C-alpha cells in the first residue's frame, strides 16, 4: 500500500465515494487495527459489483496491510454466492489447475489418464507443443490475449475464439476494452439459459476499426438447474443431490449434453464418455449425471 496513494483518501473523500461518514470510518478502522488477526469475508456483494475486481483486490490489500494474511484466524475469504459455484470450481475451470486442484504438471495429467482410462500420449497430442503444462489466461485478462501485441503473449497466436459458459462480464472493470476484444474475435459462443450481458455486449455497435466482418456469434440455450439432475457443492464442501423437476424447455440442452456434442464434433466424444452410461433425452444421447459424479469422486477424492 503506497503512502502517497493513501494520503489522497481523506475522510471527506471516503465519505464522497462510499457514503460512510468520518466517525463510522474511524470506528471501523480502529476496530480492525485493535482486533488482529481477523478475517474478511465477502460474497457476491463484492464479486458481482460493477467494480467487483477492484473491490476484491482492495479487500486483499487491506488484509495484507493489517498483517492478517497467512495466519490462523486471518485471511481474505470469499463465500460462494450462488448454487454450486464451489462445485464447478472443484472440477477444474481455473486456468492454472486441473480438476480437484491438481497442478498442470505431466504427473497430474498421467493421474487423470489412469483414472479416466485413456492413453496419456493421446491426451498430450490434444495440445499444441508446450501448452499442456502452461497456465492459461484468467477471466479478467482474456482481453489482453486478444488486444496485446503477439510478442507480449506467451503463445503462438492471439486469442481468436471465446466461450462464455454460464458467465457474464458485468463485474469486470474493463468494459470498453472488452467490447473491442469481442469485436475482434473470430468466434464468440454464449452458453446460458437466457441471452446474457455477454450477448448484449456482443450485439452492441462498436467502432468500425475493431469490427471483424467474419466474426461468428452463437447463442446456445442451456437448461436451468430445474431441467436436469446433478450434485451441488456448498462453500463448506457439503454435497447435495438435486433431482430434475421438469423436462428441458424449447431448444435448451443440459451442459453435459452440450459438452458431449461439442466433443463429438471435435473428435473425442468417445473418450469423453467412455466411463458413462448414456440416456436418451428428446432423442439425443446424454451422459448420465450419476456416472459423471462417480468419475469425479474416483479422480479427485
Identify what each model region corresponds to.
Residues 1-72, 78-301:
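Non-catalytic alpha/beta scaffold blocks inside enzyme catalytic domains
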Amino acid at each position: 500500500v503506497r503512502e502517497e496513494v493513501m494520503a489522497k483518501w481523506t475522510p471527506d473523500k471516503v465519505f464522497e465515494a462510499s457514503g460512510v461518514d468520518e466517525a463510522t470510518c474511524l470506528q471501523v478502522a480502529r476496530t480492525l487495527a485493535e482486533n488482529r488477526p481477523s478475517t474478511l469475508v465477502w460474497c457476491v456483494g463484492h464479486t458481482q459489483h460493477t467494480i467487483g475486481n477492484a473491490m476484491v483486490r482492495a479487500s486483499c490489500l487491506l488484509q495484507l496491510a493489517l498483517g492478517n494474511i497467512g495466519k490462523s484466524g486471518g485471511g481474505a475469504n470469499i463465500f460462494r454466492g450462488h448454487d454450486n459455484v464451489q462445485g464447478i470450481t472443484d472440477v477444474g475451470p481455473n486456468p492454472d489447475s486441473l480438476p480437484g486442484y491438481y497442478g498442470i504438471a505431466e504427473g497430474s495429467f498421467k493421474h487423470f489418464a489412469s483414472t479416466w482410462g485413456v492413453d496419456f500420449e493421446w491426451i498430450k497430442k490434444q495440445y499444441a507443443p508446450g501448452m499442456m503444462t502452461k497456465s492459461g489466461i484468467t477471466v479478467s485478462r482474456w482481453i489482453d490475449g486478444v488486444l496485446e501485441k503477439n510478442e507480449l503473449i506467451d503463445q503462438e497466436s492471439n486469442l481468436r475464439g471465446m466461450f462464455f459458459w454460464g458467465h457474464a462480464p458485468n463485474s469486470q472493470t474493463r468494459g470498453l476494452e472488452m467490447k473491442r476484444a469481442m469485436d475482434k474475435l473470430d468466434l464468440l459462443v454464449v452458453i446460458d439459459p437466457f441471452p446474457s450481458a455477454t450477448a448484449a455486449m456482443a450485439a452492441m455497435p462498436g467502432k468500425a476499426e475493431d469490427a471483424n466482418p467474419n466474426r461468428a456469434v452463437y447463442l446456445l440455450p442451456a437448461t436451468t438447474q430445474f431441467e436436469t439432475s446433478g450434485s451441488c457443492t456448498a462453500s463448506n464442501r457439503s454435497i447435495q443431490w438435486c433431482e430434475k423437476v421438469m423436462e428441458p424447455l424449447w431448444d435448451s440442452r443440459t451442459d453435459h449434453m452440450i459438452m458431449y456434442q461439442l466433443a463429438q464434433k471435435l473428435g473425442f466424444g468417445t473418450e469423453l464418455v467412455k466411463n458413462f452410461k448414456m440416456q436418451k433425452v428428446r432423442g439425443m444421447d446424454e451422459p448420465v449425471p450419476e456416472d459423471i459424479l462417480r468419475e469425479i469422486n474416483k479422480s479427485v477424492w
